[in-house]
From Swiss-Prot:
Residue positions of motif 'HIGH' region: 13-23
Binding site for ATP: 334
Record localization: Cytoplasm
Keyword match Magnesium: no
Lineage, broadest ranks: Bacteria, Pseudomonadati, Chlamydiota, Chlamydiia, Chlamydiales
CDD domains the UniProt entry points to: Anticodon_Ia_Met, MetRS_core
A GO molecular function held by the record: metal ion binding
Protein name: Methionine--tRNA ligase
Protein's organism: Chlamydia trachomatis serovar D (strain ATCC VR-885 / DSM 19411 / UW-3/Cx)
Pfam families reported for this sequence: Anticodon_3, tRNA-synt_1g
Keyword Protein biosynthesis: yes
Length: 550
């Protein structure tokens, strides 16, 4: 039985910098498109996201910036929330891992894992700064590479030769912040024995959706699981109940943020127990959207943590991964100057242009590349030349000739064939959305626009108008507007603003959108939406949907 309740989460953006196009197309646009599609299907959707606000990268960069940790994450939490809004990401609640509910549930996860013998303490040697009076994690350490001798190697990897190692393996290790020499000291940490859950995890991943090319990677990762430290010597983080001066590793606490974020949402709507109907009900369908670099944590580690709990937390049903989006052949990097200012871009180009192109080139099974030339080509050829042209020419002709009120006319077989083909493409689009393929959905959108253009060209109503055959003209316009109604429906998850403009211009009488949130259209993708027999349209002066990109 198909679930009527859908839980959607996407990887929590790290509160350590602005989001770029790679982040958006990797996790947040796909999640938003899926959420919009499922709402159209009439499902009860909850899309949760939020900022990941702990970890060494945050403490180090906050200190380098001369800012307090909370001040630093507050800045990026607001920035990420604003970015979601600008990009039309219809998240239902944007929380953060510094929320009120997070510490208690993280500590509860830990205690449950301890009670089941899955977490054990172990003494290891780590680098200690006498001057600073604390252990230093790898990001705080520099030294001489044990492989090539480079004297400014990082604590986890040598940027000169590419070698990776433990920070304690560095020669002449020193503090990155003060330059003080470091020594080795014993310290006690808690380790999660993931290898003890290998068989459970292998069985689990066999039953979930993964992109085909990821399944072997995930299986191999689980086969080679080993214990992982869940604690760190830091002051910024969730305190560990039974280890003094320790906090939880960010990889341990961050995914629990999906649950605490849902608790945060429940409190915000005045129903503190509402989170349970999504996290403690196995009939819910749970889809998680992430970049490929987060796969191991979400396919193995977080499910292992859930398996070790006393409460039956919902585990993911579909783990939807994306590869990397490159910019002109290189990874997005603000520090290297290889990035696009998102605010400046959106001041120049419409949001739906960006959403469409990012969806059309989505790195679903392999890395893909964003280039301005492809952006320009797709906008001008597809959005202006095919899509916008179809909508504009039909409405302009209808308004010019006074055919603004259309109702179901007498149709010929070729009209019925056209309607049937249009319906088939709309149903194809639904299948693509259901299978998490933005690329195929974009192709189908353009295929439907091309079908409509072809029909309008072939039937040439302007010739019939000259002959005075207005009944036939109205029949052609009716069929073209019906096609545009379907085009708006299948476009909405990717281009919501454009879809709403089309529906406003053709004004199908079967729809009453006045009471709906335009960002969360609900229950439109129904059999009645596809029924044309009783449909009527009240056409308005066309508004240009897209302009050429110079």
């Amino acid at each position: 039985m198909e679930s009527s309740r859908i839980l959607i989460t996407s990887a929590l953006p790290y509160a350590n910098g602005p989001l770029h196009f790679g982040h958006i197309t990797g996790a947040y646009l796909p999640a938003d498109v899926y959420a919009r599609f499922q709402r159209l299907q009439g499902k009860e959707v909850l899309y949760i996201c939020g900022s990941d606000e702990y970890g060494i990268a945050i403490t180090l960069n906050a200190e380098l910036a001369g800012m307090g940790y909370q001040e630093y994450v507050d800045m990026y939490h607001k920035l990420h929330k604003d970015t979601f809004k600008k990009l039309g990401i219809s998240v239902d609640f944007f929380s953060r891992t510094t929320n009120t509910y997070h510490p208690a549930i993280v500590q509860d996860f830990y205690r449950n894992l301890q009670e089941r013998g899955l977490v054990e303490n172990q003494v290891t040697e780590q680098l200690y700064s006498e001057e600073e009076g604390k252990f230093l994690a790898d990001r705080y350490v520099v030294g001489t590479c044990p492989k090539c001798g480079f004297d400014r190697a990082r604590g986890d990897e040598c940027q000169q030769c590419g070698a990776d190692y433990e920070a304690r393996d560095l020669k002449e290790p020193r503090s990155k912040l003060t330059g003080a020499a470091l020594s080795l000291r014993d310290t006690e940490h808690a380790y999660l024995h993931l290898e003890r859950m290998k068989e459970d995890l292998l069985a689990f991943v066999q039953g979930i959706y993964l992109r085909p090319h990821m399944r072997n990677f995930v299986t191999d990762y689980i086969e080679h699981l080993r214990p992982r430290a869940v604690t760190r010597d830091l002051s910024w983080g969730i305190p560990v109940p039974d280890l003094e001066n320790k906090v939880f590793y960010v990889w341990f606490d961050a995914p629990i943020g999906y649950i605490s974020g849902t608790m945060d949402w429940a409190a915000s709507i005045g129903d503190p127990e509402a989170w349970k109907k999504f996290w403690l009900d196995d009939t819910v369908t749970y889809a998680q959207f992430i970049g490929k670099d987060n796969t191991s944590f979400h396919a193995a580690i977080f499910p292992a943590m859930e398996i070790g709990q006393s409460l039956p937390y919902k585990k993911v049903d579909a783990l939807v991964t994306s590869e990397f989006l490159l910019l002109e052949g290189f990874q997005f990097s603000k520090s290297d100057g290889n990035f696009i200012d998102m605010d400046a871009f959106l001041e120049t180009y419409s949001l739906d242009k960006l959403r469409y192109v990012l969806a059309a080139i989505a790195p679903e099974t392999s890395d893909s590349e964003f280039s301005f030339q492809e952006f320009k080509t797709r906008c001008n050829s597809e959005l202006v030349g095919k899509y916008g042209n179809f909508v504009n020419r039909v409405l302009a002709f209808a308004v010019k000739n006074g055919c603004t009120e259309l109702s179901s006319p007498q149709l010929e077989q070729k009209d019925l064939d056209f309607i049937s083909k249009s319906q088939k493409l709309a149903k194809d689009a639904a299948e693509h959305y259901a299978q998490y393929s933005l690329r195929k959905a974009c192709s189908t959108i353009m295929e439907l626009a091309a079908l409509g253009n072809g029909y309008f060209n072939d039937e040439a109503p302007w010739k019939l108008a000259k002959e005075g055959n207005w009944n036939r003209v109205r029949a052609i316009l009716f069929c073209a507007c019906y096609c545009q109604k379907l085009l708006a429906l299948i476009s909405y998850p990717i281009m919501p603003e454009t879809a709403l403009k089309i529906l406003e211009m053709i004004a199908p009488h079967s729809l009453d959108l006045g009471s709906q949130d335009p960002d969360r259209l609900q229950s439109l993708w129904t059999d009645s939406f596809f029924d044309y027999s009783e449909e009527k349209f009240s056409l308005k002066e066309p508004e240009l949907l897209f302009t050429m990109v110079e």
